[in-house]
Structure formats: C-alpha cells, structure tokens
Amino acid sequence: MVICKTGHVAALKACYYFGIEVRIVGYNKNYEMDVKEMKSKIDSDTICVYTSYPNYPYGTIDPIDQIAPYCSKKNIPVHVNMCLGGFLVPFLKSETTEKGFNFPKGVTSVSLDPHKYGLSAKGASVSLFSD
C-alpha cells in the first residue's frame, strides 16, 4: 500500500496486522501527497493508494484529482480517508474543496467518522465502496 507520511496511523497498523508492505511517500510544500514520488512507489504489487481528505496533522487535502486518474489507468484502487472531514469539508466553500469533492474515476472506497462532526455516537464509522 502506498500512503503519504501524513496518512493516519491506523492504516499503518492495519497493514502491520495483515502483513501488507507499506510504501511511504513524502509531501509537497502544501503538505499534500507528493504525486511524483507516489508514482515512483507504485509497481505491480501495489494493492492500494491511501489518500486523505483532509489529513490529520495539517488539515490539507491530497490531490485526489491527480492521483485517482493515474491509479485508475494502472488498475490500482484509491482509498480516501474522509474520517476527519467527511461531514464537514464538502460543505465548506472554497476552490480546493469544491474541486476535490467530486471524486474522479479511480476512487474505490472512502471512510467517514460520523462521530466527529456528524453528531453520532463515539466510535461510529462508515466505509463506502464503489461498485
């Protein structure tokens, strides 16, 4: 699995439990996944690219509009972690969030935590998968 340094530690923990190789990518000057470096980490053994919308350390959104189309061409699933901002960021008005919310082809799953901003019970979580 390819993941940015800013990705949530729970993804790393899951990879450890399931014996999945992790390839960590750096971030650019805006604290978003470095797409060029991400491309260099992908090979035939890559099972997923893990992105954040937004990430926990900085609150920035990975460039999903660049990542998903590239991965789609290579038949690599893209997961978007929206646990922190899934019930908040889509409703903010800015060029970045409006552009990033309409996920391009290639995004195969998202995760959301309604307990953060969705007024749900603590520990509630949602995973959505494309068909």
Task: Tell where the protein language model's regions lie, with residue ranges.
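Conserved PLP-enzyme active-site core in the AAT-like
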Residues: 1-131
